[in-house]
Design a protein with these regions (language model features):
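Short, Lys/Arg-enriched N-terminal segments with co-localized hydrophobic residues
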Residues: 1-7
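Short, surface-exposed, charged amphipathic helix/loop patches that serve as local interaction elements
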Residues: 9-100
Length: 100
């Protein structure tokens, strides 16, 4: 039954769209200087399962979170560690749901 298959595919497709959380963007009120460049926003790409597996061996919560933020934002771990705490806390809030 072709109609049944199309309906099923549409239902699955709708679920995929609903399940996609997307990339997260943090806009900075005061630009951050990183590597000599002025940063006005930080984008964290939505982690995939392989990204979560890549940090699952890290037992320290802070190190695991910093590593995931670095992996998904394009900044190095050292750069993330130099971020002001208030910016790190906002970034942590964006990735924390994936680390539960």
């Amino acid at each position: 039954n072709k109609k049944g298959k199309n309906k099923m595919a549409k239902t699955i497709e709708n679920k995929k769209v609903a399940a996609y959380l997307g990339d997260a963007k943090l806009e900075l009120s005061t630009p951050l200087i990183v590597g000599g460049k002025e940063i006005k926003e930080i984008v964290i790409k939505e982690p995939k399962v392989k990204d979560l597996k890549a940090v699952s061996h890290i037992h320290n919560d802070l190190d695991r979170t910093v590593t995931l933020i670095a992996n998904k934002s394009g900044f190095t771990i050292d750069e993330i560690e130099d971020f002001p705490t208030h910016i790190y806390m906002k970034l942590q809030g964006l990735v924390e749901p994936f680390l539960r």
